[in-house]
Amino acid sequence: MKLFLKKYGIPLLGATIMCLLLFFLRKIQNLDFNTKEIFIMVSIFSSTLLIRTVDDIIDYKEDIRNNKKTFKIHLSYILGSLLLLIGIIMNILSVQVISTLLFIIYVAYMTFAFYKKSRILKIFIYPILIVVNFTQLMFINNGLINYPISIVYISILTILTLSISIIFGIVKKG
């Protein structure tokens, strides 16, 4: 239990805050919650768990290079996988398969880019990615952007993130 809280506590707290903000925004606008908002909330939690799990997988790969055997399968991986699966199913029901796949690839790619370049950025990875992906989901759900534009949107954000990561990496090394 302590291991689960240590690894997932802060990211899940960030996701909870994001969901509460969404809830209060809906209440301020005097709008009722519908299935779309619930799907978005599940997506926020599942993407947070995906980010944390990818982070652990990268840690595991680095441990292999250092000849250390510290990787352990524990309850948080099983729980993370189940919640991720639920998030994917919910996303498919509310959005489309294409945007769901883009969403998953994007989260995994951004996580890798952040983690490999700077420890400073790693601290901010969870809230940044939750906000970015939440925004992307809102755009797609509201029909404000179509799939070709969403691909451009993801590409621009990825390039910007990589650029910031590289700059921080150079500053840190310098």
Predicted segments — roles?
Residues 1-174:
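Multi-pass alpha-helical membrane architecture of UbiA-family
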